[in-house]
């Protein structure tokens, strides 16, 4: 079985793929100092809760936090005797080549999203990923990643507002019943929710106009279902797109190097 690890700035997700479907998905907060032993304790405890004892044959990692990769490598080596495939490293081949400015690095999560989107839907699409940042990733007709947009994430915006404005509280994001708020919390929720609806609509409209061809819009990330409620922002929402992209990248590398 394949263990897929997606480490972002806020959360780290472990998912186990049996070749056809996900056995389980586990999420924890990202900590730079978390040790390999701590990862194993957390991982094995949750596996016991799920009542499964999978045979992990391979591991693939996508991480936007370089400092965490070392401890994840130690975790894989110590407890599975495996050398993980790390997206973005020279020994990890991609089924497509990014067409971006020379010397520009592309986040491994964005590459995985592009690969997953192309595998499921073909090209000419834009992936909107709600993470610490809100990313818009454009996938060309041939599957190449050709660029995108990075905007502040929803929760990051809420935190910045609470930190920067002494009189404003930190609130949780939800879809307001109305645009006009009648109390401070409702006003903040309305501003952030409807502000991001406008952001998504505006940026995807401009991307489509600049691209010059019809495009599918795919939502992913933890908050995508919230923003899809009653709004025509996405053609589809897929909460496992990044992880699915990792399975495609892993298979591509195994097919290239079957040994």
From Swiss-Prot:
Enzyme class, first EC level, given as a word: transferase
Binding site for substrate: 107-110, 184
Active-site residues (renumbered): 109 (proton acceptor)
Cofactor: NH4(+); K(+)
Residue ranges of the TM segments: none
Gene3D superfamilies given in the database record: 3.30.420.40
One term under GO cellular component: cytoplasm
Known role: Catalyzes the phosphorylation of pantothenate (Pan), the first step in CoA biosynthesis.
Quaternary state and interactors: Homodimer.
Protein name as annotated: Type III pantothenate kinase
Species this protein is from: Jannaschia sp. (strain CCS1)
